[in-house]
Amino acid sequence: MEKRGGGSSGGSGSSAEAEVRKGPWTMEEDLILINYIANHGDGVWNSLAKSAGLKRTGKSCRLRWLNYLRPDVRRGNITPEEQLIIMELHAKWGNRWSKIAKHLPGRTDNEIKNFWRTRIQKYIKQSDVTTTSSVGSHHSSEINDQAASTSSHNVFCTQDQAMETYSPTPTSYQHTNMEFNYGNYSAAAVTATVDYPVPMTVDDQTGENYWGMDDIWSSMHLLNGN
């Protein structure tokens, strides 16, 4: 009997753990969390999750609220002006996303980090490969032309003259603060290229559902019987 009782206790614990939901949040869960915080405020997140009737961890509730559901979280595409600020501050501070987010009201550090990695950084890497290949081909052509010219006209260049015809291969993304330039990539060129719409349904990195606020508030009225 004692042995069976011990097994029952373990099974209960496993059952409780299995009830914790993982994966993307549903709109129903979002509405429950928004409604609860609107009426009771936030607080100890583990207690809040249980009190609200959500089968989520306190950490999951906290991150969902802070990164997606807070009323002051700014929605919609990152603007060209915001892109310039992100590039300027990243050139100064690197991957200090929380510090950068303080200069972009309504944007979260997670959103800025995802935008940087999936938009700006991706563009810089792709451009670097293209530019390096193009410049390398151009230099090879110059060298061949110079060799042919020297052979035909019996012209001998001094070492100093040869150095003057050589320009080093550009490097991408150097931490400079000159007119927002990243090595050979101006902010204007990058922002013009990476002005893609930010998904309003699924987050690129986390896979979380991302609702429009109009959808959420219209559903809130239905939930509250208004």
Curated annotation (Swiss-Prot):
Post-translational modifications: Probably ubiquitinated by COP1. Ubiquitination takes place in darkness and leads to its subsequent degradation, thereby preventing to activate photomorphogenesis signals.
Annotation: DNA-binding region: 45-69, 97-120
PROSITE patterns, per database record: HTH_MYB
Compartment list: Nucleus
Induction statement: Up-regulated by jasmonate.
Pfam families assigned: Myb_DNA-binding
Tissue: Mainly expressed in floral tissues. expressed in all four whorls of the flower, in the anther vascular tissue and in cells at the junction between anther and stamen filaments. Detected in the nectaries and ovules.
GO BP terms: gibberellic acid mediated signaling pathway; jasmonic acid mediated signaling pathway; red, far-red light phototransduction; response to jasmonic acid; stamen development; stamen filament development
HTH myb-type domain mapped to chain residues: 17-69, 70-124
Keyword annotations of the record: Activator, DNA-binding, Nucleus, Phytochrome signaling pathway, Repeat, Transcription, Transcription regulation, Ubl conjugation
Positions of region (Disordered): 1-20
UniProt superkingdom: Eukaryota
SUPFAM superfamilies: Homeodomain-like (SSF46689)
Coiled coil recorded as keyword: no
Sequence ranges of Gly residues compositional bias: 1-13
Gene Ontology molecular functions: DNA-binding transcription factor activity; promoter-specific chromatin binding; sequence-specific DNA binding
Result of knocking out the encoding gene: Short anther filaments, delayed anther dehiscence and greatly reduced male fertility. Myb21 and myb24 double mutant is more severely sterile than myb21 mutant and has petals that just grew out of the sepals but ended at a lower level than the stigma. Myb21 and myb57 double mutant has an intermediate sterility phenotype and petals that grew to a final height parallel to the pistil. Myb21, myb24 and myb57 triple mutant has a strongly reduced fertility and an arrested growth of the petals that never grew out of the sepals.
Quaternary organization: Interacts (via N-terminus) with TIFY10A/JAZ1, TIFY5A/JAZ8 AND TIFY3A/JAZ11.
Entry protein name: Transcription factor MYB21
Organism: Arabidopsis thaliana
